[in-house]
Amino acid sequence: MIPRGIERVVIIGDGLTARLRRAYARLWERRPRRDGQLQTAGHRPEGGAPTQGDNRCVTPTASISSELAQRIHQAIAQAGGWIGFDRFMAMALYEPGLGYYTNALQKFGAMPSSGSDFVTAPGLSPMFGHTLAVQVQQALQVTGTSEVWEFGAGTGALALQLLDSLGDAVARYTIIDLSGTLRARQADTLAPHAHKVRWLDAWPEVIEGVVVGNEVLDAMPVQLLQRTGGVWHERGVVSAGEKFAWQDRPTDFRPPLEIEGEHDYLTEIHPQAEAFIASLAERLQAGRGGAAFFLDYGFPEAEYFHPQRHMGTVMCHQLHQADADPLVAVGQKDITAHVNFTGVALAAQNAGLHVLGYTSQAWFLLNLGLAERMAQASLAERSQAQRLVNEHEMGELFKVIGLATSGDWAAQGFDRGDRSHRL
């Protein structure tokens, strides 16, 4: 079933600077239709139900959380006492200077003692980026381009690994990132390649080349839908004194699939991620073309909206611990939701792109030669790289989808284990 009312615009926050407002307006300006049928061409734990928090979290960074909470309370009041979770999530993550991805708090790192909250694949092993570079190089050759684009580059580790591996095949590496703090860290990391790297905080009109996004889609705001007593509601956030609380309102929104049964059911829909893909498709097709590869945790639609997955997938991450309560410690922890890869594929196809393939991260990296790299590495290096493909870690939980303006070539990363037929 098509989510009704999908045209509703999510307001990111009244306090956005003009620059960030323009950036997000361009980033999420379109809502793709879900009226097409899929056609295929040529590390964080499982989610759980958001629960009412007790707001007892006290940390050295409580002042950031307190100021951000006040900003959100103001937004709730201005909206008449209720905002959708998508707006809450957007403010918690991206409110200028206060949101999780825009404040100066440490985020990425392998050890909680450093103050970090989680580690991503490039920080786990440089073999991740060096192996991904094989796919990027093939895509650059096929598309006849020489520019790589990365959304949400984190510490810059993946960019460094790709630039080190690709050499002269890349003339320019463009990072689109809204975080000034992370941008400074990226600049330090990428100093050896400074002559090739540039940063943008908004969409360009044209994108030519190869786009990569590692754990980008999961951080895009989602809407929460709750079925209670057979009636669908949108779950939003209200003020409860100094705290936040959940409040459900009847809605015409529906999940894209009919959920069997009459049991209570919590899930998400992803208009922001689908609009992002549609905007990307428009810009790739405005120039000479290109390809895009997104790596993230998620499922095909049939798995995402399985009747037994009744608690949703929204999760938070702080100091390498996961919890299911986004209403506490706002600005101090990451908020994510799993990716509906069927929705991504349909959004791409409806906008004119081809699906090159869809598979697990393990198959993708093994197809690109990770096993051969590991055979030449030290025991410690092999141990770290093994986590990238271990079935019980990143290997199966994380998936990869490839998109391109042309579907008449076979992307090496999907040679074996392609699951496009499951989308």
Identify the function of each model-found stretch.
Residues 43, 54-55:
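Intrinsic-disorder-associated, low-complexity terminal segments enriched in Asp/Asn/His/Tyr and depleted
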Residues 18-21, 26, 30, 35, ...:
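Intrinsic, low-complexity polybasic segments
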Residues 58-151, 155-205, 225, 363-366, ...:
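Rossmann-like AdoMet
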Residues 149-151, 176, 211-214, 295:
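Active-site flanking residues adjacent to catalytic metal/cofactor-binding acidic residues
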Residues 196-198, 209, 290:
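Short, conserved active-site loop motifs that form the nucleotide-linked donor/cofactor pocket
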Residues 254-423:
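Long, Lys/Arg- and hydrophobic-enriched amphipathic alpha-helices
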Residues 212-258, 307-317:
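A mobile, often basic/glycine-rich helix-loop segment
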